[in-house]
C-alpha cells in the first residue's frame, strides 16, 4: 500500500504527517481547474508508481497541462505498467530530505537520522549526504517522531524511507520507498548500523535489538553516484572499461561490481558504482570525496 504514491499520501495524511497539496482524480476537469486556481502554477505531474524521475513533468502554464499529463502517462505506462498520474503543487526551492526507518513485526520502530538528497538532475539523485546541513536538532527530532508514530500506526515491517520536501522550516511528505535505497550507505556510515543485516533479521521474524536511544549520528558521510554517461550529453554510455582503479583508504567506501575489462550493458540504469566518504565533519568528508572521485 505504501509503494503507491497516491495511497501513501492518503495514509500519511490520516496519520497526521503533512503532505504536499495535490489532486489524485484527473477525470474531472472542473476539479483540476479548482485545484490549480487554489494552489497556482507551477504544478508537477507525477506517476503513481515507480520512481527514478520517470513519469514526471513540471507545468508552468495552462496551455502545457494536457500535454504534460499525456506524456507522463505514456512514460509511466512504459516504465511501470501503470499509467496513473496525479498533480501536486510544485515547490520551487525545497530541500529533499528523507528519513530512514527500520521496523520489526513486534511493533518496534526506530529512525536512523536523515539523508539530504537535494542535488539532483532530471529528478534523479546524484549526491546524498547524512546528516543534512540545513536541519536543526529540533526539526530532525520532530519529523523523526512523526515518522515513528506513522509507521507504528500502519504496522510497517522492514526497512523503508519516507521522503519529504523541506521548505521554510516545513516538511511535506512526498512518497515512501518500501525497500533499501541506493543511498543507504551514508546512513550506515554515520550510525554504524548495517541496514542490510538488520533487514534480513527482521524479514526472518526476529525482534529488533536496536533501541532509539542507541542510535547516535556521528560525523558526516557523502555519497556520489558514478554513472556511465557521455560527458557532454549525459546519455547512458555502454561499453568496455579498459582501465579501472578503485580508490580506498580511511573514510572511503566503494560499492560497485565493475572491474578492468568489465562490459557495461546497454540495458538498465547507467549507474555503475557509488563512492561513499566519511569524516568527522562535513568538510573532511567532502575533502575525501574530491580527492578520490577522479581515481575511479
Positions of predicted regions on the chain:
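N-terminal beta-alpha lobe that positions the nucleotide/phosphoryl donor
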Residues: 1-162, 166-181
Amino acid at each position: 500500500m505504501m509503494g503507491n504514491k497516491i495511497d501513501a499520501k492518503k495514509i500519511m495524511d490520516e496519520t497526521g504527517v503533512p503532505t504536499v497539496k495535490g489532486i489524485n482524480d484527473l477525470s474531472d476537469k472542473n476539479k483540476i481547474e479548482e485545484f490549480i486556481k487554489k494552489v497556482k502554477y507551477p504544478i508537477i505531474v507525477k506517476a503513481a508508481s515507480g520512481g527514478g524521475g520517470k513519469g514526471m513533468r513540471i507545468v508552468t502554464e495552462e496551455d502545457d497541462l494536457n500535454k504534460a499529463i499525456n506524456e507522463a502517462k505514456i512514460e509511466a505506462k512504459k516504465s511501470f505498467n501503470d499509467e496513473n498520474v496525479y498533480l501536486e503543487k510544485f515547490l520551487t526551492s525545497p530541500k529533499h530530505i528523507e528519513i530512514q526507518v527500520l521496523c520489526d513485526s513486534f511493533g518496534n520502530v526506530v529512525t536512523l537520522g536523515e539523508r539530504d538528497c537535494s542535488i539532483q538532475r532530471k529528478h534523479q539523485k546524484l549526491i546524498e549526504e547524512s546528516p543534512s546541513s540545513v536541519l536543526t536538532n529540533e526539526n530532525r527530532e520532530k519529523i523523526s517522531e512523526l515518522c515513528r508514530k506513522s509507521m507504528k500506526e500502519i504496522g510497517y515491517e522492514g526497512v523503508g524511507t519516507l521522503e519529504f520536501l523541506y521548505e521554510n522550516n516545513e516538511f511535506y511528505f512526498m512518497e515512501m520507498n518500501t525497500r533499501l535505497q541506493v543511498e543507504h550507505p551514508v546512513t550506515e556510515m554515520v550510525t554504524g548500523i548495517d541496514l542490510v543485516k538488520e533487514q534480513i533479521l527482521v524479514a526472518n521474524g526476529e525482534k529488533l535489538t536496536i533501541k532509539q536511544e542507541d542510535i547516535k549520528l556521528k560525523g558526516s558521510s557523502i555519497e556520489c553516484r558514478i554513472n556511465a554517461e557521455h560527458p557532454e550529453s549525459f546519455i547512458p554510455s555502454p561499453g568496455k572499461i579498459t582501465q579501472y582503479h578503485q580508490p580506498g583508504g580511511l573514510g572511503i567506501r566503494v560499492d560497485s561490481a565493475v572491474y578492468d575489462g568489465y562490459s557495461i550493458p546497454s540495458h538498465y540504469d547507467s549507474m555503475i558504482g557509488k563512492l561513499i566518504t566519511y569524516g568527522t565533519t562535513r568538510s573532511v568528508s567532502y575533502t575525501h570525496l574530491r580527492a578520490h572521485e577522479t581515481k575511479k
